[in-house]
Amino acid sequence: MHEQYTPRDIEAAAQKFWDEQQSFAVTEQPGKDTYYCLSMFPYPSGKLHMGHVRNYTIGDVIARYQRMLGKNVLQPMGWDAFGMPAENAAMKNNVAPAKWTYENIDYMKTQLKSLGLAIDWAREVTTCKPDYYRWEQWLFTRLFEKGIIYRKNGTVNWDPADQTVLANEQVIDGRGWRSGALIEKREIPMYYFRITDYADELLESLDELPGWPEQVKTMQRNWIGKSRGMEVQFPYDKASIGHEGTLKVFTTRPDTLMGATYVAVAAEHPLATQAAQGNPALQAFIDECKSGSVAEADMATQEKKGMATSLLVEHPLTGEKLPVWVANYVLMHYGDGAVMAVPAHDERDFEFAHKYNLPVKAVVRTSAGDEVGSEWQAAYGEHGQLINSAEFDGLDFAGAFDAIEAALIRKELGKSRTQFRLRDWGISRQRYWGCPIPIIHCPSCGDVPVPEDQLPVTLPENVVPDGAGSPLARMPEFYECSCPKCGAAAKRETDTMDTFVESSWYFARYASPNYDKGLVDPKAANHWLPVDQYIGGIEHAILHLLYARFFHKLMRDEGLVTSNEPFKNLLTQGMVVAETYYRVASNGGKDWFNPADVEIERDAKAKIIGARLKTDGLPVEIGGTEKMSKSKNNGVDPQSMIEAYGADTCRLFMMFASPPDMSLEWSDSGVEGASRFLRRVWRLAQAHVSQGLPGKLDVAALDDAQKVIRRAIHAAIKQASTDVGQFHKFNTAIAQVMTVMNVLEKAPQATEQDRALLQEGLEAVTLLLAPITPHISHALWQHLGHAGSVIDAAWPSVDEQALVQDSITLVVQVNGKLRGQVEMPAAASREEVEAAARSNENVLRFIDGLTIRKVIVVPGKLVNIVAN
């Protein structure tokens, strides 16, 4: 055994061994417990960042631990390889996105391997390869034929300069991120998944996921947004509108119907279009509403604007004439593109009514009273007893709901309805680097799915996009084709799919990545699925995790999987944060400096109180800790850390510095500390091994001092097993190992029994560290005399007998204050403990002259004497 700990050599040797032995290749083994551990696969951006390292280390620790429990463990890896960044990089570097993507994958794969992850690389999937997306296209055609995918017009952000559609995040202050042109809202035909058909099930089956964080389930419940309300129809005023009809609205507050003073419609609503005829000012306002972002978040924060029309509708219960307004806060694709406005009890309507001098009528008695003032109060939105509501006065919310519904049904002007906030999922993207949509547009036959024997529709990979619209739409060699039904000349769809589609089913493909007869091999999929443990960032709580759950149900309904949910347990890891440093630039902006380029000064409590740039020695501002990012220049390159300290040190620091679900603050001194600890373990093992391995430990012959050491070893095993197995608290498990190391370093090594006990301790340390620092554990296990590999060793078991104590120390309190200690046999009775406490010399001083009222004995811990 080498005297020095040399991580580079140790890690290279372990990784070579795992590769040669194919240690992590898995096959289905019926009858053996399975465990599927999956971390969210990365986008191949170019190189790993510390967030990746943390995510994949957490997954690897769990996977290796489960393997030590004797389970057949699957831990695969792949690449979420389609998407905008590749197109942007391609334009910047004048290189095809495919080339850029594949080069990044090669480099990042090398990085992942250097971390020593227990991954079955034979199952690798790359979503931009035709053998992957072919099956996505196959499923698309099946769902299109069933009507679960349909085509309709959707509102998008249109950049008139680049002639392309922009995502919401590409619209900055109403302008295109690249062209700077004012953005317009456009209606274009798009494909949609009917996810709303599954809304109820997606909501209800959240209750089948006790292994998910409550926060994530709440976020999904809110996103799905089930609400019971009322569909209310306001009859058209024939005199102003010119024909009969009704304006349909949905409200969750039908109890406030008697307080409606106007109605508002979206700019795209037919009534808005009618009102704008011959009214250029209104038409201009409608055009203004149609430009700008279609993002819901932007709509919520923008200034509320409106314009009156000359149109009126009738209140369904009173017949009162209400004015129709066009408002920018009403969305055509939400509800029915119209709202009834009750300014007294809705903040948005209140703001609008005050701005445009519209009537406010209170109809609910709230904790703020019966009147509504000139400033909005949260109380105005409360439920309460109805007032100013004719025959409905005095009713509470539930009573009013039923009574108003009955009145509307009698007039055939309304009924209760359940509505969801969730909208159908539009997946058409006018982008190049994505999965082609397998539809052919025929002048005679309409939209025709590409037949199975013509799949995949392959994306040409030698294209360099220029940013002006989709390159596919300018490639006749791609879109010119013949109709599969009638053989006439037809046009292939040039939109590609939202990249969330690929990541919605990849977890299932890992079960049979090379299967060529279908999306998944049902036998393999049902052997492994659902995933036992899924690990990823909380930022994916809604979209990715909701879409993956939806896709799992689609696959179930296609007969491909039998389970209802894809992920049994979910761990959302915290961010990796680091200090930030900057100087204010001459233009008022900030120049950010990497922590590695800054020299810091700390106070006695280790708080940073000053910082200077190493190059010029001049001060820089301290910006506090922030998530590692390029924009703040506070990232640490994992590769440089691995080269300097080794992967095991990085893994140990990541797991020790914070519980996995909390933010982790990067600390160079913490990394140094992790490295020092591994050197200590190596040093102790090397000194032990160099004297020759001892014989077997005779547990029955241990003296009291040896029993204390053995108790420390097994107490650590017990606690670490709970921490890792039940709570994923790797930081406290590592703390247990450190405690044992302190004991072992001080333990005597004079006799054969002493050395046999040290051998047991070092084996326990090696096994407890094996999932966390696998390379050093691989080497230590061999040096400690084991023929097999540590990855095939079992997790250490607790000898409960070792934890039994012959005697225990109890603290003695008088009136809750510590006044002494007594050493007692572990089996001592309550009476014996009380007698010993009362006769303790120090305790006697504090109870002298007092009357003892009560003696409380907490077995094994303390005695409290209450006296006055």
UniProtKB/Swiss-Prot annotation:
GO terms for cellular component: cytosol. Keywords: Aminoacyl-tRNA synthetase, ATP-binding, Cytoplasm, Ligase, Nucleotide-binding, Protein biosynthesis. It is found in: Cytoplasm. It comes from the Bacteria. A motif ('HIGH' region) lies at residues 42-52. GO terms for biological process: leucyl-tRNA aminoacylation. GO terms for molecular function: aminoacyl-tRNA deacylase activity; ATP binding; leucine-tRNA ligase activity. ATP binds at K630. It is an enzyme of class 6 (ligase). Its EC number is 6.1.1.4. Its main location: cytoplasm. A motif ('KMSKS' region) lies at residues 627-631. Gene3D superfamilies: 2.20.28.290, 3.10.20.590, HUPs, Isoleucyl-tRNA Synthetase, Domain 1, Valyl/Leucyl/Isoleucyl-tRNA synthetase, editing domain. PROSITE patterns: AA_TRNA_LIGASE_I. It catalyses: tRNA(Leu) + L-leucine + ATP = L-leucyl-tRNA(Leu) + AMP + diphosphate. Pfam families: Anticodon_1, tRNA-synt_1, tRNA-synt_1_2, tRNA-synt_1g. PANTHER family: LEUCINE--TRNA LIGASE, MITOCHONDRIAL (PTHR43740:SF2), LEUCYL-TRNA SYNTHETASE (PTHR43740). Belongs to the class-I aminoacyl-tRNA synthetase family. This is Leucine--tRNA ligase. It comes from Pseudomonas putida (strain ATCC 47054 / DSM 6125 / CFBP 8728 / NCIMB 11950 / KT2440).
